[in-house]
Amino acid sequence: NHYSYSSPPPPPVVSSPPPPYYYYSPPPPV
């Protein structure tokens, strides 16, 4: 077991939801 219990667990990978327009329109140009 090489788990580092001394260190806090990594935060869950939960990216912010995309903007509403993303669902019906292409992303804005960069």
From Swiss-Prot:
Keyword Repressor appears in the UniProt entry: no
Subcellular location: Secreted, Cell wall
Major site of localization recorded for this protein: secreted
Annotated keywords: Cell wall, Glycoprotein, Hydroxylation, Secreted
Post-translational modification: O-glycosylated.
Residues modified as 4-hydroxyproline: 8-12, 17-20, 26-29
Gene Ontology cellular component annotations, sorted alphabetically: extracellular region
Protein name: 136 kDa hydroxyproline-rich cell wall glycoprotein, major component
Organism: Phaseolus vulgaris
